């Protein structure tokens, strides 16, 4: 890693010169590529190459966001948007494994069934239902402790509406746009936390 204050304390994703292989640095579709050793992980015995190529990105991203940045605890309630996507399905599994009550949104019956299969306690069809209202109905009007929103502008205000007082929204992406309108009254009056997370830090894979 580099020599900035963030790299020195083991947080290279905060470095101003942080780059992602395949996004900022081309060439990762080549059959062979030379990269720094720190960018590599050993493939565990019994894990096929397709799984090894796909799992680290989404599971490390979700783990850092939920556990390391979001400080998720057993017994909390978590709403995961886009639960059938890469980060979404990883977040559902991590939250369930952590002992949380998991709500998940998905757009088809098949995807909702998959979310339930991997750990969601409640599934919501976001194409038919106001997911914030559905969550509040399921929680007796309280809302959830944590919302995982990597969708962005289209869902941001509803994510804030779905939170209980003192809740926190975790974001690692903005598929539908990164400039949502935000109700600041709701954030400060309900004492909500907005927590951003990007990729993973060194050692996240081992901890996860």
Which role fits each region the language model picked out?
Residues 28, 106-114, 131, 179-184:
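Short, glycine/polar-rich helix-capping loops at beta-to-alpha or helix-loop-helix junctions
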Residues 124, 145-148, 170:
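N-terminal Rossmann-like NAD(P) cofactor-binding module of classical short-chain dehydrogenase/reductase
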Residues 98, 106, 154-208:
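Glycine-rich phosphate-binding loop and adjacent beta-alpha segment
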Residues 130-141:
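Short amphipathic alpha-helix with an adjacent loop that forms part of the alpha/beta core around
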Residues 83, 151, 174:
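NAD(P)H cofactor-binding loop motif with strongest signal on the N-terminal glycine-rich segment
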Residues 1-40:
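Glycine-rich phosphate/adenylate-binding loop and adjacent beta-alpha elements
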Residues 48-129:
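Mid-domain Rossmann-like dinucleotide-binding core that forms the NAD(H)/NADP(H) cofactor-binding site
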Residues 68-73, 138-140, 161:
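Glycine-rich helix-loop-beta junction characteristic of Rossmann-like nucleotide cofactor-binding loops
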């Amino acid at each position: 890693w580099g020599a900035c204050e963030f790299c020195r304390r083991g947080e290279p994703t905060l470095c101003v010169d942080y780059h992602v292989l395949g996004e900022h640095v081309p060439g990762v579709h080549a059959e062979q590529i030379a990269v720094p050793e720190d960018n590599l992980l050993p493939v565990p015995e019994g894990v096929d190459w397709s799984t090894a190529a796909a799992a680290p990105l989404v599971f490390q991203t979700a783990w850092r966001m939920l556990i390391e940045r979001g400080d998720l605890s057993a017994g909390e309630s978590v709403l995961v948007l886009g639960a059938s996507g890469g980060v979404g399905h990883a977040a559902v599994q991590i939250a369930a494994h952590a002992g949380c009550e998991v709500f998940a949104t998905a757009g088809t019956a098949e995807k909702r069934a998959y979310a339930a299969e991997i750990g969601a306690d409640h599934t919501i069809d976001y194409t038919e239902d106001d997911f914030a209202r559905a969550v509040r109905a399921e929680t007796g009007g309280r809302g959830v402790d944590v919302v995982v929103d990597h969708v962005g502008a289209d869902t941001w205000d509803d994510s804030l509406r779905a939170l209980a007082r003192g809740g926190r929204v975790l974001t690692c992406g903005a598929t539908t746009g990164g400039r949502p309108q935000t109700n600041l009254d709701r954030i400060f009056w309900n004492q909500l936390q907005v927590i951003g997370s990007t990729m993973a830090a060194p050692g996240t894979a081992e901890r996860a």
